[in-house]
Design a protein with these regions (language model features):
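Short glycine/proline- and aromatic-enriched beta-strand/turn motifs that initiate or cap beta-hairpins
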Residues: 21-69, 223-225
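Gram-negative (and chloroplast) outer-membrane scaffold detector with strong preference
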Residues: 27, 69-150, 213-226
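Outer-membrane beta-barrel translocator domains and adjoining extracellular loop/strand segments
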Residues: 42-50, 91-101, 145-156, 197-206
Length: 226
């Protein structure tokens, strides 16, 4: 009986050993995977000069890129995390009778952006658990660049396109599942507050529109703990 108990205890320790310490203060975690920015946008009416085109709106499509996370554990349960990614590219569309009569395709142009986000992250589970859910809150800076008009928009007389950079809050929930003491599967969802103003010109008239991009950001990948 004693031998049976010892054998059972040894087996339990052997199984638990890989997860004896999921995270500890000082750990560095690197994650990589597919990340999708899915805009949940709403826009003001498009303004042309002093006129407002009622009901004429702007919109953005989604894009998927390589996402990267770098985290440092300040304590066993609290970490600081930086979100990075390869540049996202979105089509900028317009909808409404007036703008679509000018640009029938509805495509104003394209833009690229990088949304680095710095967050404080909390892991509520005990460190010996293989399953490590977490929540985070942080600040985002979105840098828009390579804003370009479509050929249809240029043919209609539009010139230049500029999107204003944005600061905003970001919240997230996620989970790691430890496959080994160092390797994990990760899934996470974020909501990021991104507000921007798009500016272009139609002839000599300035065209502007305010857009609350406010995307949901999804990422699935693998991670490694150093």
């Amino acid at each position: 009986m004693r031998k049976t108990l010892l054998a059972a205890s040894a087996l339990a320790l052997a199984v638990a050993a890989p997860f004896a310490s999921a995270y500890q203060a000082g750990d560095i975690i690197v994650r990589a995977g597919a990340i999708t920015v899915d805009p949940n946008e709403s826009s003001s009416d498009i303004n042309v000069g002093a006129a407002t085109l009622a009901g004429e709106k702007a919109n953005l499509d989604s894009d998927t890129q390589l996402g990267l996370n770098f985290a440092y554990m300040v304590t066993d349960k609290v970490g600081i995390e930086l979100l990075a990614a390869t540049p996202f590219k979105h089509n900028v569309g317009m909808k409404g009778a007036t703008v679509n009569s000018l640009v029938p395709s509805g495509k104003l142009g394209t833009l690229k952006h990088l949304p680095p986000t710095l967050s404080a992250v909390y892991y509520p589970m005990d460190s010996n658990s293989a399953f490590q859910p977490y929540v985070g809150l942080g600040i985002n800076y979105t840098w828009f660049f390579d804003d370009e008009l479509s050929s249809d928009a240029e043919a209609a007389g539009f010139r230049g396109l500029d999107m204003k950079d944005s600061w905003g809050l970001a919240g997230q929930v996620g989970m790691d599942y430890m496959l080994t003491d160092n390797i994990m599967v990760n899934a996470q969802v974020r909501y990021i507050d991104i507000e921007t103003t798009g500016t272009t010109y139609l002839g000599t008239s300035k065209v502007t529109v305010d857009v609350d991009v406010d995307p949901w950001v999804y990422m699935v990948g693998l991670g490694y703990k150093f």
